[in-house]
């Protein structure tokens, strides 16, 4: 069964809040994800905050959700979110709340958090929104637990994200939850972005943790390592991929990532091993071969070192 992502397009919608997550999901579908994207609105014709008319699509009341589907709520201009038209739309608010209670996951991008808060969904829930609106969100809805200076939050099937670009980060995070970190990496690479995480995450994927730099040669090497982790790693070969001498490559790699090449390879192997261990059909020797190790003993040693640290 496909996981459905239904975007609720409100009047004065912010186009980037809509387009960023939608395109990210589309790229995931192109890579084979069993996702389905749908759209609904509140009026016959919605006009975006930038003046783009969006012709009639399905009214939200016509949408039927399944447990595990996602309701995506892009941000809209505050003039609409503070309007009587929105505040008095009890049909919309009751619909959103009922969907959440049925097991649908709700996800707001930017000022879309005000919609969830108006429905009461964010009561006693950690959440965030655009940095210019966090104080306003907390003041208007004092039961919320607004978090500052983070990209996104996740609690009890409720996802909220900060500014425009963080909607892409949140969508990549959801894709990773559903399809795994390597699949999310492929989508991020297709979009020419590298995933970032919020400070509340207990565990950050090592596929992305050391990508907070702009050196194209080092990114190219990191891509190669991730995609070829089952192969033997040769420092000279990696330096060639980066287009550098070995000495210069090892120096620049550590400067840009904050970690040595060998330690980075080890981190990627650990993460891959943890993913493979979830598959009961894979033997330890098979797992070893999948991450470029020679034996089950090497796998155990690697994971024991990880626990000791």
Description of each model-found segment:
Residues 1-106, 115-117, 176, 185, ...:
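Extended, subdomain-level signal for the structured scaffold at the beginning of enzyme domains
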Residues 19-22, 138, 169-172:
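Predominant activation on well-ordered alpha-helical scaffold segments within soluble catalytic domains
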Residues 115-120, 168:
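Acidic/polar active-site rim loop that often engages polyanionic ligands
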Residues 122-150:
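A conserved active-site-flanking secondary-structure segment within enzyme catalytic domains
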Residues 150, 154-192:
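Conserved anion/nucleotide-ligand pocket segment
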